[in-house]
């Protein structure tokens, strides 16, 4: 115990009173969509394992093979110990997958956004003497906001997915000398809606802006062969994504021009000062890149499940917001109602996590349903039935 513990405990008690305290729940995984908790098996509707690859035998085999052949750890930063042939191979494959000149692997999605953006935005002051003008969607992921804050720039926030508002803001600042950056997501992780990437590309070209697109929840799921929404729009200036969701593994990437990636190698603190990913993790990424382009049937199945979930929830009176992807929020409102509903779902064998402020705006707490190609229609119907029963039992009206 430290002398500061009473301060922390008082703050924790306050979070608890407001139904905002977060706790870790021990679980064991039994395949991509089954977890065991407190002796019970639950159908998992909370994981981002969108293609069900986290337990795929090809990924397991490649992880074992590369670990046995190349070792367990990488030892240090790539700038200290060098870049392995496995790294070169995976980055080259990733660049081909994304249709870019180059790609760079990083440790996690959070680290990528938090570290890449400050390095990227620094180019404005270096080349123009003025800070970057950064236009960001109001509902961007916390890591994107953190990266902009770490860069010391003031974000110019546009209304969510409102390209008219974005163009108005861009036009207002045409006379300013700083380089322009548009920073947004292709799929928004809490609402499950999509950005108009083609429209963003048009505005970026019209106003001479650099388009940075977070594809964490689109990579593997959307676009031709799962290459993301940027592939439908003719590309963006820099695409970021993760391997920890649809690709079933761990790590993150950015993909863009050779000049941009080379700049990041020299200036991105999260790349320079981080130990490189282990060979086994690189093996998982390599195997996933073999599989993902071939999984059109799984992507179609996943889209059908999402349509079924939205229709079923709507028939029960629940709002699923603007969702058009595999992420389907069941919007409950108050945080305590979301927690009660999540516990009641668990009692019925369903794992649906309550998402509360500050992750989502106050008054929009929800059960975030994340669907997987490993689910089937019967599982979705069971979730809808459990949702109806749980809400009725606890008097939680849509």
UniProtKB/Swiss-Prot annotation:
Keywords per UniProt: Acyltransferase, Biotin biosynthesis, Pyridoxal phosphate, Transferase
EC numbers for this chain: 2.3.1.47
A single MF term (Gene Ontology): 8-amino-7-oxononanoate synthase activity
Chain positions recorded as substrate binding sites: 22, 29, 141, 359
Residues modified as N6-(pyridoxal phosphate)lysine: 245
Pfam families in UniProt: Aminotran_1_2
Biological process, per Gene Ontology: biotin biosynthetic process
Keyword Acyltransferase in annotation: yes
Catalyses which reaction(s): 6-carboxyhexanoyl-[ACP] + L-alanine + H(+) = (8S)-8-amino-7-oxononanoate + holo-[ACP] + CO2
Cofactor: pyridoxal 5'-phosphate
Family membership: Belongs to the class-II pyridoxal-phosphate-dependent aminotransferase family. BioF subfamily.
Function: Catalyzes the decarboxylative condensation of pimeloyl-[acyl-carrier protein] and L-alanine to produce 8-amino-7-oxononanoate (AON), [acyl-carrier protein], and carbon dioxide.
Assembly description: Homodimer.
PANTHER family to which the protein is assigned, alphabetical: 8-AMINO-7-OXONONANOATE SYNTHASE, CLASS II AMINOTRANSFERASE/8-AMINO-7-OXONONANOATE SYNTHASE
Protein known as: 8-amino-7-oxononanoate synthase
Originating species: Gluconacetobacter diazotrophicus (strain ATCC 49037 / DSM 5601 / CCUG 37298 / CIP 103539 / LMG 7603 / PAl5)
């Amino acid at each position: 115990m430290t002398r500061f513990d009473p301060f922390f405990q008082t703050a924790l008690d306050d979070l608890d009173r407001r139904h905002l305290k977060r706790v870790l729940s021990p679980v064991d995984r039994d395949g991509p969509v089954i977890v065991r908790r407190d002796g019970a098996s639950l159908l998992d509707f909370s994981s981002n394992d969108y293609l069900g690859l986290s337990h795929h035998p090809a990924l397991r085999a490649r992880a074992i093979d590369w670990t046995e052949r190349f070792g367990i750890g990488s030892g240090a930063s790539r700038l200290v110990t060098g870049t392995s042939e496995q790294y070169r191979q995976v980055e080259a494959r990733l660049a081909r997958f994304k249709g870019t000149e180059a790609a760079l692997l990083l440790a996690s999605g959070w680290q990528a956004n938090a570290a890449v953006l400050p390095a990227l935005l620094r180019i404005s002051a270096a080349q123009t003497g003025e800070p970057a003008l950064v236009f960001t969607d109001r509902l961007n992921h916390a890591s994107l906001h953190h990266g902009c804050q770490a860069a010391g720039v003031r974000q110019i926030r546009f209304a969510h997915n409102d390209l008219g508002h974005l163009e108005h803001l861009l036009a207002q600042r045409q006379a300013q000398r700083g380089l322009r950056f548009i920073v947004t997501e292709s799929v928004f992780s809490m609402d499950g809606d999509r950005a108009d990437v083609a429209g963003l590309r048009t505005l970026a070209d019209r106003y001479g802006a650099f388009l940075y697109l977070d594809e964490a929840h689109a990579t593997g799921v959307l676009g031709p062969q799962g290459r993301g929404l940027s592939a439908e729009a003719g590309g963006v200036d820099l695409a970021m994504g993760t391997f920890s969701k649809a690709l079933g593994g761990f790590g993150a990437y950015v993909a863009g021009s050779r000049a941009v990636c080379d700049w990041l190698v020299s200036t991105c603190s999260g790349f320079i000062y981080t130990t490189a990913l282990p060979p086994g993790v690189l093996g998982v990424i390599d195997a996933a890149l073999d599989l993902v382009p071939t999984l059109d049937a799984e992507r179609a199945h996943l889209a059908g499940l999402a349509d079924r979930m939205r229709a079923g929830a709507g028939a029960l009176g629940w709002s699923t917001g603007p969702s058009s992807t595999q992420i389907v929020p069941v919007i409950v409102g108050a945080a305590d109602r979301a927690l009660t509903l999540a516990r009641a779902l668990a009692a019925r064998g369903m794992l649906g996590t309550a998402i509360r402020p500050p992750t989502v705006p106050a008054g929009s707490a929800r059960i975030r349903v994340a669907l997987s190609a490993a689910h089937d229609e019967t599982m979705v119907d069971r979730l809808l039935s459990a949702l109806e029963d749980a809400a009725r039992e606890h008097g939680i009206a849509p």
